[in-house]
């Protein structure tokens, strides 16, 4: 391949394969380009959940996991799997970083705070990891333990928080220590798009006790529902006892963030760890607790990490760079980390010959208000740069991000926008004799309501499609596979040898 005959990988985020038409934004959308490509060019389906991508059996995939496996060309055992195994085999309770922090807080008379997403969605966190931390605190005789519960509503049903709150309260009652100190929708606590005003509200609730008030976590959720908020959007609420906050994060306290996925953990982490911080005004007495990251959120975050990163070598980006190929990574803000950091195996540093282009996502509260997102701008940027690169890896965020809103009509519009943009990409590549691979990373937009018609905002375990478009594959057939097989297929198309670390195999028959 050369810039005159480029190879392009287009990742359709959240575009899964579903049999039902009801609640299926992809099936209901008008997609003339997609339909034509499927009828003409080689296609197959790829497994993208559970053990096929390094997750526990039956666990739905997600964008982070999908891009890791796509770029690595092998099954990458995910942090969820690693940490859950550590809990089961007991090594979690011997983790030196966790023990050091908890023991120091007890020894110095300070509290232990545990913050993170209260959910079993398995995308950003798992409630079982929180329970393990609570048990570890007891083993180390730390009884001043406070939970700051971020509510999900995206990776699990949108109004399911009471189930998790009840499970947490039952656990605390069984243990005989600990309390919930705040309840905050992930919209505020886990923003990743530099909407610092959201992060600020979460921070001030935890540090200053500012925000709405409730006498219990259950009441905080119920009051949110009364205001018409689903779990994700429940406003930061401080739990009070006798009119005073149950607990606030103070200097010298220990604060363990039990989310394992980095992208939505970084902003709130930096508000606690960065000495020089410009995201928002932290107030007259910012807290600098003994902060622990469950996994590495960013190499530049100065805080100990309980479960360090896996080192992945010979990823697709490494191989392309070593063979002197110029590559572009292109996405809008919401998925930029996925085509860069995650696709490169959890490494921020770019390879020689790798350029990156970030297109800002629109500034709207939720993407059902603008289902087109920045797809057309991403496409314009692609067309402006197609002559410069041998390989372009790009992402369309719409099916996933709009799918998460649960608004079927908006998701249909999102899918139609992507189909329009995909047509422009394919036309430009074919005009230059190149090849386009179109792949999903996980399901979402193909299953947006349950049998009763209630909205579903979470990912699915459905497989995703893979199409290969170009004269180089005319008349060829593709075998079924999984996401790990995409990178070896790209190397096969380029005539490059597959490194031994890649356990996936080419899908070309």
UniProtKB/Swiss-Prot annotation:
Mn(2+) 2 binds at residues 13, 63, 441-442. One of its GO terms (molecular function) is phosphoglycerate mutase activity. Catalyzes the interconversion of 2-phosphoglycerate and 3-phosphoglycerate. Monomer. Binds 2 manganese ions per subunit. GO terms for cellular component: cytosol. This is 2,3-bisphosphoglycerate-independent phosphoglycerate mutase. Keywords: Glycolysis, Isomerase, Manganese, Metal-binding. Pfam families: iPGM_N, Metalloenzyme. Substrate binds at residues 124, 154-155, 186, 192, 261-264, 335. Mn(2+) 1 binds at residues 400, 404, 459. GO terms for biological process: glucose catabolic process; glycolytic process. It catalyses: (2R)-2-phosphoglycerate = (2R)-3-phosphoglycerate. The active site is at residue 63. PANTHER family: 2,3-BISPHOSPHOGLYCERATE-INDEPENDENT PHOSPHOGLYCERATE MUTASE (PTHR31637:SF0). Pathway: Carbohydrate degradation; glycolysis; pyruvate from D-glyceraldehyde 3-phosphate: step 3/5. Its EC number is 5.4.2.12. The keyword Isomerase applies. Its cofactor is Mn(2+). Belongs to the BPG-independent phosphoglycerate mutase family. CDD domains: iPGM. The keyword Methyltransferase does not apply.
